[in-house]
Amino acid sequence: MAVQKYTVALFLAVALVAGPAALYAGDGYAPATPAASATLATPATPAASPQHAGTTEYHIVRKAGLNEEKNAARQTDDEQKRSDEINCPDFNKSVHCRADRLPVCSSTSAHSSKQDVAWMLGYGSIQGFSMDDASVGSVSSEFHVIESAIEVITYIGEEVKVIPAGEVEVINKVKAAFSTAATAADEAPANDKFTVFVSSFNKAIKETTGGAYAGYKFIPTLEAAVKQAYAASSATAPEVKYAVFETALKKAISAMSEAQKEAKPAAAISAATTTISASTATPAAPPPPQLGTATPAAVAGGYKV
């Protein structure tokens, strides 16, 4: 079913951001005291297992665990309702699920571990649900789940401080644009929903950011990928919809993470290259340059016009 599989893909998309974010959080946290775990329906992992309990990620998981039993009860009581109606309001609370299933974070395994656990939790969360697979319900669910995914990414970025403050602010504006576009699309006829979403989203994001978002690497990437992923919902075969949706989101979120990790090293390499160019462009120039005319070395040194 389309909505179920889209939900799994979005779990993966969030994990692709959370994984690199965890690498910047550090591995030196001491285990937290297990007092709060008494409220969980399932006991936390044994004390001997290093869970990096001081990280923001762990606390997100702990909060999610407190809501899991309540959410499961609601789903049981409302079997005739669409699962997207039941789950979407609680997406932010249950995105990572139980604390005892959080993988150990390390600089070498966090990224792949989070992809694995995202698939596991995403698949497990859809088992046994009653689902209305109507296209209109699917469209509405996708919009709101994407909006919630943006919210989770924003929260992780603010807490772990991987994403610069300016880009976190832009993410908040993108989230607001999603909300505006989703509302407009929900009210449009079924055949016009995608067109209305794209036009409303473009208008809202330009109004809220003033075009400044184009200066950031991953905002335009995310914008384009979500449109491409949603456009795939017009395909007739569910497996084709899902493959395109998953691929587009995976590439976009991976590109966002990589651009963020490589931004500073790339800037340093660029500066070093400029310095080398400046020192080698003019062969054996006299130490005190007396000429008033700019030399080729000065031009190579990176003067901005």
UniProtKB/Swiss-Prot annotation:
Question: Positions of the region Disordered?
Answer: 65-87, 279-299
Per its UniProt record, what Gene3D superfamilies does this chain match? Group V grass pollen allergen
Comp. bias intervals (Basic and acidic residues): 65-85
Q: Which UniProt keywords apply?
A: Allergen, Signal
Signal sequence interval, chain numbering: 1-25
Give the similarity note: Belongs to the Poa p IX/Phl p VI allergen family.
Q: What is this protein called?
A: Major pollen allergen Pha a 5.2
Q: What is the lineage of its organism?
A: Eukaryota, Viridiplantae, Streptophyta, Embryophyta, Tracheophyta
